[in-house]
Amino acid sequence: MTAKQTIESGKAILGIEFGSTRIKAVLIDEENKPIAQGSHEWENQLVNNLWTYSIDAIWSGLQDCYADLRKDVKAQYDCEIEKLAAIGISAMMHGYMAFNDKEEILVPFRTWRNTNTAKAAAELSKLFVYNIPLRWSISHLYQAILNGEDHVKDIAFQTTLAGYIHWQLTGEKVLGVGDASGMMPIDPETKNYNADMVKKFNGLIASRGYKWTLLDIFPKVLNAGQDAGRLTVEGAKKLDVSGHLQAGVPLCPPEGDAGTGMVATNAVKQRTGNVSAGTSSFSMIVLEKDLTKPYEMIDMVTTPDGSLVAMVHCNNCTSDLNAWVNLFKEYQQLLGVPVDMNEVFGKLYNHALEGDADCGGLISYNYISGEPVTGLAEGRPMFVRSANDKFNLANFMRSHLYASVGVLKIGNDILFNEEHVKVDRITGHGGLFKTKGVGQRVLAAAINSPISVMETAGEGGAWGIALLGSYLVNSGANESLADFLENKVFAGNTGVEIAPTAEDVAGFNIYIENYKRGLAIEKAAVENKY
């Protein structure tokens, strides 16, 4: 069947993911291969000192992204999308979206980037004897309670961004287990919210007199492959303003960007892992057993089918690096040289590999925003050197590439060196890996492990959630998600692997020691520069 026939017969599957700077739609065929795509650029706003996206921006962004997909389908195949076999919605995890019983949002969406929840996260971590990160939805909820925010009494439903969009498209208040594990801890045995912690939380807030308990307002947890409702007539109109798309399409459980990244890199099996490196970064290692104790810098989440995952999440990754590359672009424009950004990135990234393995002593702190792993509530991007360091372009670029995964290294060193976690394969995806071989080599040095990158890595989470849509409608009886991906999607494709060199690993270790010692400078900058 051709792509055109797949679309016209309603066999195509749609995946849409809301990233922090881009909303992306991918249409796949029965072979699970992308056949069309659309996108929409967007940015978060800092309103009253909190990072947010407006409800209007969410819907206009979704509609523009879908319209862009329709345009691509029209241009490539000269047809319209009338029916679909399945739809999947995914988005940035965590954060706070609270609604009243009239479906009105009570306060502007508070995204994962907000680090104003320190008191709540610390109290809950102590209560649960479990690391509860600042950005988790339960931290945001409890912080609003601690702040005495009036809206809390009116909460009828609290969810994530993916859960919100799914609810509006289907009427179902559900969430995939992976995304739910970023709201509050999941019990891997029941694949549901940890019942003991739910009970403790309800006890903690009992004296405050709210008319709800936690399970009244949190979404129902679903596993990959479970029915999560169908596109309603109103939902179809909200997605496709042209009116071509028909209602009744089944949707898979909405997932978080961590889960879709695992799917897109075939890393849902135990002893596999993946690293997503873009505006923010995270590593996900699927564990064989629980860690021996909670660590503040390691979050425990799950795969979309409920296996336990150790996640190291960093708020900052490539934004500062991109800002420096942009500076070189401006210099090029000043000289009157035509600018091709792919060429600028390619030249600078590859030149970085000619620098010293330890960056010649140069250090970069890429903290556009706060970084909980290193204990910073706010960030100040900073480049530091001593007068006698080897200051040249290669070392300069290399230090910024190292910085993009430096915090990730600090967290993963605990997993590999202290918890002795074993991994057979780690796959990289995201913007850092666009320039062939460079980001891969840097990450391999950082975590002293071979890194694979697949050709499909650039498809990212939108393709991952489309695959979860495919799993909903195309999996065999009792076929696990790992088997479905292995047999029907990747079929032996493990991508291109780069192993770390001893020199790179030793150099990165020196760099990270300098980096840790210099954190006092970053802290001083946060405290003194406004």
Predicted features, each with a name:
Residues 2-8, 14-15, 81, 119-175, ...:
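Active-site core segments that coordinate phosphate-bearing ligands/cofactors
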Residues 1-108, 122, 154, 215, ...:
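N-terminal glycine/serine-rich phosphate-binding loop of ATP-dependent small-molecule kinases
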Residues 114:
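Carbohydrate-associated surface elements
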Residues 74-111, 131-133, 166-178, 182-187, ...:
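Short beta-strand-loop/turn "lid" adjacent to the catalytic site in phosphate-handling enzymes
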